[in-house]
Swiss-Prot record:
Catalysis performed (reactions): N-acetyl-beta-D-mannosaminyl-(1->4)-N-acetyl-alpha-D-glucosaminyl di-trans,octa-cis-undecaprenyl diphosphate + CDP-glycerol = 4-O-[(2R)-glycerylphospho]-N-acetyl-beta-D-mannosaminyl-(1->4)-N-acetyl-alpha-D-glucosaminyl di-trans,octa-cis-undecaprenyl diphosphate + CMP + H(+)
Main location: membrane
Record's keyword terms, sorted: Cell membrane, Cell wall biogenesis/degradation, Membrane, Teichoic acid biosynthesis, Transferase
The protein's annotated pathway: Cell wall biogenesis; poly(glycerol phosphate) teichoic acid biosynthesis
Enzyme Commission number(s) of this protein: 2.7.8.44
Enzyme class (EC, first level): transferase
Matching SUPFAM superfamilies: UDP-Glycosyltransferase/glycogen phosphorylase
A single GO molecular function term of this UniProt record: CDP-glycerol glycerophosphotransferase activity
Record flagged with keyword Membrane: yes
Descriptive protein name: Teichoic acid glycerol-phosphate primase
Function field: Catalyzes the addition of a single glycerol phosphate residue to the prenoldiphosphate-linked disaccharide, as a primer for polymerisation by TagF.
Swiss-Prot/TrEMBL induction comment: Positively regulated by WalR. Mainly expressed during exponential growth and rapidly shut off as cells enter the stationary phase.
Amino acid sequence: MKIRSLLANCYLYFLSAIAFFLQWVKPESKVTLLISFEANAKAILEEYEQGQYSYKLNILYTQQASAIAESFPNVDAYLLQEKNPIHLIKAVYLMFNSKVIITDNYFLLTSVLNKRKQTKCIQVWHANGSLKKFGLEDITNMQRTKTDIKRFQKVYSSYDYLTVGSEEMANIFKKSFGIKDNQLLKIGVPLTDPYYRENKKKISDTLNIQRKKIILYAPTFRDYNMQSIQLPFTEEQLIHQLKEEYVLFVKLHPAIQNNIDIKYSSDYIKDVSNYALFDLLMAADILITDYSSVPFEFSILNKPILFYTYDLKLYQQKRGLVDNYLSIIPGRACYDSESLINEIQTPFNYSKIKVFSDRWNKYSDGNSSQNLLNFIENLIS
């Protein structure tokens, strides 16, 4: 932990040095997307290409979000390898040359904007809800040094605005990032836009599973176990107890996707980690997750959600969950496969899903990207 902290601080000093030597750069009528996930960026870029906006939009993307550059060839896109000094210099230049930065994650890079009042930073975040504690609320902060916390705060203080889809998430951001009410843009979260449109993907045809229902298992990652995954069902259970009616799709979290080889390509269990989450959620009949943010967007579709919480106490202890987790989730917390199977075989209470979605997607109505780009238009005009 101490070595990582030292390296992070050295990285921060290097960024500060770059910012000092590039302080002469003047902002133009440009907006730069600084992204590590595809969902928000895709929704924003689709709206940008359809609309009439006075500013130019660029993309700074990490390897994890590289598909974005391929999907939008008409937009200038630059790969960001955060350990590459040349990439960092170029990134700071692009940011300083822009009037607005839109980001979707925690980047130390945005700390250079703290003394850059002519460039505004908008955090759209990569989730429209949260069941985990993060930021200043993260329980692992107890193991951090004061210097670490100060470094985190430098990043959080670089956010001029944050988009939110609900009062619940607004309150979480205020506690997690130490921000104020006047920084909150209650215009919805861009990544939710596609869920309000009819756009069902034929993944069932692609993977040759016609006539079977899809159970999508999309767990979050465990900091304390990045090398393995516990599946909710065996192939035998899918065949015998669930009567061959379902196929289990497994979507790994990006943080562990390259660490684990599920080695399943059977008729009943398939690794679909390389597919876009949106496409999988549209195709799924049932979602099984745990402490992930996936239910917040999936709930818009009003389809059954189950929670496989076999390590609830351990996760709470190691990572930390929001208060009243069990009363917030719109489905039963199941601690073993038998409980999950029983829930699947029992009629589902859809009213819980609607209440959950209405609560957490209050400001998301399918027009969040347009709302954001219009806000930026007014901001820089």
